[in-house]
């Protein structure tokens, strides 16, 4: 199955370590204080939902898919104004 998730980071500089650890764990990220919010891994037949409070600090918050080899291209930014 082709799995995907969305992991929103508080600090983009944490991305390499969080991605590396997740890829070593089958794509599932470990609980980490540097993660703002995340969905569980899901396949194309599933829907997942999360609810969270966006940071009050304006900025760009990186989101990535942490499934194996996906983070390089499956990424973007949540913009807080």
Walk through the language-model features, giving the residues of each.
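Extracellular/periplasmic metallocenter environments
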Residues: 1, 32-81
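Beta-strand signatures of extracellular beta-sandwich domains
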Residues: 5-9
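Solvent-exposed serine/threonine-rich low-complexity stretches and specific carbohydrate-binding patches
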Residues: 21-27, 35-36
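Short aromatic-acidic-glycine turn motif
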Residues: 11-22
């Amino acid at each position: 199955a082709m799995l995907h998730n969305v992991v929103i980071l508080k600090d983009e500089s944490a991305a390499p370590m969080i991605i590396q650890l997740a890829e070593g764990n089958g794509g599932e990220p470990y609980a980490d204080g540097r993660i703002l919010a995340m969905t569980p891994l899901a396949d194309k037949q599933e829907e997942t939902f999360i609810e969270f409070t966006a940071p009050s600090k304006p900025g760009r918050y990186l989101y990535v898919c942490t499934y194996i080899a996906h983070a390089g291209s499956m990424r973007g930014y949540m913009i807080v104004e």
